[in-house]
């Protein structure tokens, strides 16, 4: 037990040192009024380990549209979504939001433009109400509950012993995966940012939870700039544009219809997933 504690402590120290080694990101707290298009212009990126993830990525995610990132595992989908919000600084090329280079925008100011709904939801040992209020710390209880209802949180919250004031445990351990994700979506409703970064998070859910979350997401993304990491092709059939990432580059981009007709990488992925879904024991 003591050895495990020592190993855990050393690992945490190593992670902290890695964070401290990163230069402090700075930038202006002023934003342009040119909308919220996200543009990747010949972007290249490598982690500190030297591993090159993106080689030459260019595409535009337009305001009011859903842009879906698809591709094989390790193709760069998750990295692209995080670079859009300047989780890290790129090695070459340029990323702009509303015409402004993200490397010149103060990180806190930039993040104010984003609502982020990823698979790994971070929750705290507090009530449902306070976990949602993280989306907007100045929101009233009424505003928090209104956002929660848009995300279908009320479907389970009002059945709990203390309702909205129920403590959900460390990282939401008292809740199911679907319930945790609905809280994450409620935060995004409460923040009401113009850009949504979304990691499709319904693959491991039961049918009821998946339906509730998809309904909530449809409400959330209306009229926003939406960049979604897609794992299942059927969920992006309604996207305005699909960007296929493979081996750190854009292999294809276009509407779902155009890419299906092109019969390239995307069409092949659709075919494979359709065959997988239709498979059954015989």
Q: What is each PLM-predicted segment?
A:
Residues 26-282:
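ABC-type nucleotide-binding domain
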Residues 1-19:
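Cytosolic ends of transmembrane helices, especially the final helix of ABC transmembrane type-1 domains
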